[in-house]
UniProtKB/Swiss-Prot annotation:
Pathway: Sulfur metabolism; hydrogen sulfide biosynthesis; sulfite from sulfate: step 1/3
UniProt cross-references to NCBIfam families, sorted A to Z: CysN (TIGR02034), PRK05124.1 (NF003478), PRK05506.1 (NF004035), small_GTP (TIGR00231)
A Pfam cross-reference name: GTP_EFTU
Organism of provenance: Aeromonas hydrophila subsp. hydrophila (strain ATCC 7966 / DSM 30187 / BCRC 13018 / CCUG 14551 / JCM 1027 / KCTC 2358 / NCIMB 9240 / NCTC 8049)
Top-level EC class as recorded in UniProt: transferase
Assembly description: Heterodimer composed of CysD, the smaller subunit, and CysN.
The protein, known as: Sulfate adenylyltransferase subunit 1
Source taxonomy: Bacteria, Pseudomonadati, Pseudomonadota, Gammaproteobacteria, Aeromonadales
Role this protein plays: With CysD forms the ATP sulfurylase (ATPS) that catalyzes the adenylation of sulfate producing adenosine 5'-phosphosulfate (APS) and diphosphate, the first enzymatic step in sulfur assimilation pathway. APS synthesis involves the formation of a high-energy phosphoric-sulfuric acid anhydride bond driven by GTP hydrolysis by CysN coupled to ATP hydrolysis by CysD.
Catalytic activity: sulfate + ATP + H(+) = adenosine 5'-phosphosulfate + diphosphate
Region named G2: 91-95
Highest taxon above the source species: Bacteria
Residue ranges of the region described as G4: 167-170
Entry-linked InterPro entries: CysN_GTP-bd, CysN_II, CysN_NoDQ_III, G_TR_CS, GTP-eEF1A_C, P-loop_NTPase, Small_GTP-bd, SO4_adenylTrfase_lsu
Amino acid sequence: MNNHIQTAISEQGIEAYLHAQQHKSLLRFLTCGSVDDGKSTLIGRLLHDSQQIYEDQLKALESDSQKLGTTGEKLDLALLVDGLQAEREQGITIDVAYRYFSTAKRKFIISDTPGHEQYTRNMATGASTCDLAIILIDARKGVLDQTRRHSFIASLLGIKQFVVAVNKMDLVEFSQEVFERISAEYREFAKKLSVDTIHIVPVSALDGDNVVNPSDKLAWYQGETLLSLLESAEVERELERHPVRLPVQYVNRPNLDFRGFAGTLASGILRVGDKLAVLPSGKESTVTRIVTFDGDLDYALPGQAITVTFADEIDISRGDLLVDAARKPLVTQNLLAHIVWMGEESLQPGRVYDVKLATKKSRGQVEAIRHRIEINKLDELDASELKLNEIGLCELSLTDPVAFDPYQEIRDTGSFILIDRLTNVTVGAGMIVEGLAAKVATGHYSEFEVELNALVRKHFPHWQALTISNDASKE
């Protein structure tokens, strides 16, 4: 057992300790930056200096540092995080590594994401659930293209809080001038990003300067340490202020006397007595019970797995979205979205993919790529396809109407994945910007052709027939 935890349990008792842990706030954050900026070392330093390493881990780390370490006689703290053998042997991070730790003030989940451009998809995966991003910058190199790329992706994935850690300050003799030059350059670049708060902090992860404890070598820096910034960062409460969104995962009917609809509340505070609408059908009813494994609730918060029952018998199935009847999202078959392409084969407009948005499954295709984003310079370039790890702004059409919110407002109902229909492999991740109007083909059509078109679109949506209208009928 970890000595820090053992001491806490002996002082408080096991029940009091577990109760305190359960009620601490949780911050999810990721570390990202250029290759070999020290991401894994920084996480190892956080774990080590906050006394979150178990005795057996420490012994294994001492042994591994002698065999695989890159820090001489010192502990190579990066080995705490670089779990894959390929990563350890190469001294780089490839996969997204998750780590958990806590302090007296807060619990943390860390995503250590790869710095290489060919692993952009891995980084997007790690960023999608985080509240805050730590952007590492090598004090010797300053702001690089990879720094800009990671900052842009984190912003695109909805992260609003950045902590920029200017690392390896020991290699520039803890120079205030170097730190201030890098700070000014990064803040100028960050004006292009959709970020609410940016803190910039000088650190040396190798020796622990200003990571957990203040350093005399950085006496000119008057701000907080890195850990202090993480402990004081605002945990995202915005979801509670948004309207209720509950994607239906399955219909719960254990007997003839009970019929509930189960799912994880995506946003809003749901209360017994609330009036909800079912989308896309639009039917409405009042919530009579909120049921959980531990019993009934008067209200539910975002992230809770619940089952709701209604006053009326209405048709609801998996994939439907239960929403605040007074604050409904848009429903459409046409979307504008940023897509991060994760497939080995390029994204080709016109090819049909399976689409999963929350619990809703449909089929769809990219009608057009408006532009590809050159993620190192943030330039918008013309493109006819998207290759592995590329990001583009795309027009997407679906076979079924879907209810959605813009991704920057509610992640769960504003994101989707594209699945290859032959291999069942996830090949793309999408963040919805807005809905688009349906495309209409106009011309001279007979009344029969217009009616047949409406019939085909209603009963055979997977044919993806365009809506047609008769010019003469508009005159």
